[in-house]
Amino acid sequence: MSHSQRTYDLLIKLLLIGDSGVGKSCLLLRFCEDQFTPSFITTIGIDFKIRTIDIGNQRVKLQVWDTAGQERFRTITTAYYRGAMGILLVYDVTDEKSFNNIENWYQNVQSYANEGVELILVGNKCDLDEKRVVSTEQGQALADKFGIPFLEASSKTNINVEECFYSVATRIRDTVAKTKGNESGSGGINIAEGEENSASKCC
């Protein structure tokens, strides 16, 4: 493939999951377009955005999928677990129910996602300290229970948003590098090829 056709070394599909209203779409918008919209419309079904980043000496193209958190869309979104190399489990630090439901989202990951998928727990809206009901310690304890990394973030004030995505992408890149090192002569990794133009977009 010529350089003009492919301007990245690795294509990674990431998934944002969590209850409706926890700010998944805002995290996506902040990371991919460096924007924040407080009146963001609820995602209907599936949306995704693209951002290409540099990790070490590699160009990594991130295809970040935003899934609807409502129960009525659950059957639609389960198909999108397949092929995801990394998943961000997102809750709202001002909404205890969204935190408690992370257990259910984690079980979905265990049921539907590929084996070896990289995970991170994200406590969103950490700028709203006066409304906080879930402590940092609670978030860390849950992440420790799952054996996954944990960060608190804010799309509004742009706290740790980059770190959330880079953390997952870097671990995936490292895993792919090890795999390719063990499989000399293997082809490049290209996840979700052909899906870039197939998403159902929403406002």
From Swiss-Prot:
It comes from the Eukaryota. CDD domains: Rab8_Rab10_Rab13_like. Signal peptide: none annotated. It is a lipid-anchor. Keywords: Cell membrane, GTP-binding, Lipoprotein, Membrane, Nucleotide-binding, Prenylation, Protein transport, Transport. A lipid is attached at C202, C203 (S-geranylgeranyl cysteine). GO terms for molecular function: GTP binding; GTPase activity. GO terms for biological process: exocytosis; protein transport. Pfam families: Ras. SUPFAM superfamilies: P-loop containing nucleoside triphosphate hydrolases (SSF52540). Residues 181-203 are annotated as: Disordered. GO terms for cellular component: endosome; plasma membrane. It is found in: Cell membrane. A motif (Effector region) lies at residues 40-48. GTP binds at residues 18-25, 66-70, 124-127. Transmembrane segments: none annotated. Belongs to the small GTPase superfamily. Rab family. Protein transport. Probably involved in vesicular traffic. This is Ras-like GTP-binding protein RYL1. It comes from Yarrowia lipolytica (strain CLIB 122 / E 150). The gene is RYL1.
